[in-house]
């Protein structure tokens, strides 16, 4: 059954039917579509547009459709244009002509907008929950591994940090990610139901009722904007893209750290794979896939931005292309967060190796300069002196702490025996605001 056709003489080409149909992907909106329809029909009853018994029959029919779909008795398939026509057609088959009254004072334009907003809100709340679970895992991993390791700039060993402080940086990134999604939910939390095609309706409907019934903060202010707004899709996918960027950065570090060149961590067998030809290989494929899927979500963002960039008000069929990008992006980010959480929950930190790496990279050079500054040497002069000491150490294959006091005094008479305690790697984290790192 088509929801349109009275003004057409010719039949729709089968090629066009298939090309036009969105049922294959928008079928996942079935719950939201039924929920929106129930709120709409209750409003029609409250406004005396439909009789009470008609409202009851329609709601009963919608509930039976939902139950049959959930029980796998009703398959969402067939030659339907979309999920809306699938549900309405099945409703009419079950309850007869009264089912044809469901769409009174409603267009598919406001119908799909409210369905999509409800779905986007629900999946985004699930993503927030998964972020919180990942944050807890990161926090537990950090508390169990408060050991020193090299901190890097330009991927070169720079200064001493702790594994705890390093991994907690991602906790804070996820904190911002969560806030961004919450802000996006706040921005989109207005109901478009009742806007109809673009200009409202001549019926005295109650948009406040349906907005409240469906859990929206309020109804939209402008009918045209209500049906043609897809900012929420763009905002959410933008949020998801930033999450993926953070997960990709963490994945990159896990990949590096698990390599023999670093050997700081071991990713469990559960989240690794092997090689079909090289028996010794243990590959960090989970992390690599997260890193790779980041580009996929970026592509979804560019896709929806491109779809929306040249569309006049109000609804245009181009907007049918909004859903697959969102579905793909939300599915991808949710699965990546869950995989990252599993990977981190079983991660082993090789504490001895992180300590050895600290001792190999002159990571107490800045502290050595600070020592001279505290003795009265201007920082720029201290910086130059320590640079010369590092060059000397490289030539002698020694670390700064391995130089005896006489060697150090060749570079500056301000050095005394207390230098060794001052530049000890653990001690360095007990001074100044560095204490916050621990």
Swiss-Prot record:
Highest taxon in the source lineage: Bacteria
Cellular location(s): Cytoplasm
Record key words, sorted: Amino-acid biosynthesis, Arginine biosynthesis, Cytoplasm, Lyase
Family annotation (Gene3D superfamilies): Fumarase/aspartase (C-terminal domain), Fumarase/aspartase (Central domain), Fumarase/aspartase (N-terminal domain)
InterPro entries: Arg_succ_lyase_C, Argininosuccinate_lyase, Fumarase/histidase_N, Fumarate_lyase_CS, Fumarate_lyase_fam, Fumarate_lyase_N, L-Aspartase-like
Name of this chain's protein: Argininosuccinate lyase
SUPFAM superfamilies (UniProt xref): L-aspartase-like (SSF48557)
Protein's GO biological process: arginine biosynthetic process via ornithine; L-arginine biosynthetic process
EC class: lyase
Disulphide linkage map: none
GO CC terms: cytosol
Gene source species: Clostridium tetani (strain Massachusetts / E88)
GO MF entry, a single one: argininosuccinate lyase activity
Known pathway: Amino-acid biosynthesis; L-arginine biosynthesis; L-arginine from L-ornithine and carbamoyl phosphate: step 3/3
Lineage: Bacteria, Bacillati, Bacillota, Clostridia, Eubacteriales
Keyword set includes Chaperone: no
Family designation: Belongs to the lyase 1 family. Argininosuccinate lyase subfamily.
EC number: 4.3.2.1
Catalytic activity: 2-(N(omega)-L-arginino)succinate = fumarate + L-arginine
């Amino acid at each position: 059954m088509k929801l349109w056709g009275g003004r057409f003489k010719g039949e729709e080409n089968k090629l066009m039917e298939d090309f036009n149909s969105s049922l294959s992907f928008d079928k996942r909106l079935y719950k939201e579509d039924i929920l929106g329809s129930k709120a709409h029909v209750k409003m029609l009853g409250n406004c005396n547009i439909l009789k009470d018994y008609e409202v009851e029959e329609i709601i009963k029919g919608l509930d039976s459709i939902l139950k049959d779909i959930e029980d796998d008795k009703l398959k969402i398939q067939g030659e339907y244009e979309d999920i809306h026509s699938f549900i309405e057609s099945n409703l009419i088959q079950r309850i007869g002509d009264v089912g044809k009254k469901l769409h009174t004072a409603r267009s598919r334009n406001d119908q799909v907008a409210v369905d999509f907003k409800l779905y986007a809100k629900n999946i985004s709340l699930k993503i927030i929950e998964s972020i919180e679970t990942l944050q807890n895992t990161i926090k537990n991993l950090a508390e169990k591994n408060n050991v020193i390791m090299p901190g890097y700039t330009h991927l070169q060993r720079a200064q001493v940090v702790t594994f705890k402080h390093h991994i907690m940086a991602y906790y804070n990134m996820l904190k911002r990610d969560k806030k961004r999604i919450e802000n996006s939910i706040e921005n989109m939390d207005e109901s478009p139901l009742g806007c109809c095609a673009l200009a409202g309706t001549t019926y005295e409907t109650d948009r406040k009722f349906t907005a409240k019934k469906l859990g929206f903060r309020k109804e939209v202010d402008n009918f045209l904007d209500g049906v043609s707004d897809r900012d929420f899709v763009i905002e959410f996918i933008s949020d998801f893209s930033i999450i993926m960027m953070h997960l990709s950065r963490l994945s990159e570090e896990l990949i590096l750290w698990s390599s023999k060149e670093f050997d700081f961590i071991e990713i469990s067998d559960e989240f690794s794979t092997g090689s079909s030809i090289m028996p010794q290989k243990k590959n960090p494929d989970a992390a690599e896939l997260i890193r790779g899927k980041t580009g996929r979500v970026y592509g979804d963002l560019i896709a929806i931005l491109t779809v929306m960039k040249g569309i006049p008000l109000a609804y245009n069929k181009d907007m049918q292309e909004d859903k697959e990008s969102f579905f793909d992006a939300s599915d991808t980010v949710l699965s990546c967060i869950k995989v990252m959480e599993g990977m981190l929950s079983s991660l082993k930190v090789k504490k001895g190796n992180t300590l050895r790496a600290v001792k190999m990279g002159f990571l107490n050079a800045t502290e050595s300069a600070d020592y001279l500054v505290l003795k009265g040497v201007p920082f720029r002069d201290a910086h130059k002196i320590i640079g010369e000491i590092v060059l000397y150490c490289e030539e002698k294959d020694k670390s700064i702490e391995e130089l005896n006091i006489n060697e150090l005094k060749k570079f500056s008479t301000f050095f005394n025996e207390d230098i060794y305690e001052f530049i000890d790697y653990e001690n360095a984290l007990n001074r100044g605001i560095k204490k916050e790192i621990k």
